[in-house]
């Protein structure tokens, strides 16, 4: 799953 937080993109699988 991918989400964007405060202009920071992180991908969690």
From Swiss-Prot:
What's in the GO CC field?
extracellular region
Q: Does the keyword Transcription apply?
A: no
Q: In which tissues is it expressed?
A: Plasma serum.
Q: Name one GO biological process term.
A: defense response to bacterium
Superkingdom, taxonomy of origin: Eukaryota
Q: Which UniProt keywords apply?
A: Antibiotic, Antimicrobial, Secreted
User: What is the first-listed, main subcellular location in coarse terms?
Assistant: secreted
- Subcellular location as annotated: Secreted
Q: Report the coiled-coil segments.
A: none
Biological role:
Antibacterial activity against Gram-negative bacteria.
- Its recorded name reads Salmocidin-2B
Q: Which organism is it from?
A: Oncorhynchus mykiss (Rainbow trout)
Classification of source organism = Eukaryota, Metazoa, Chordata, Craniata, Vertebrata
């Amino acid at each position: 799953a991918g989400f964007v937080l405060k202009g920071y993109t992180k991908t969690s699988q």
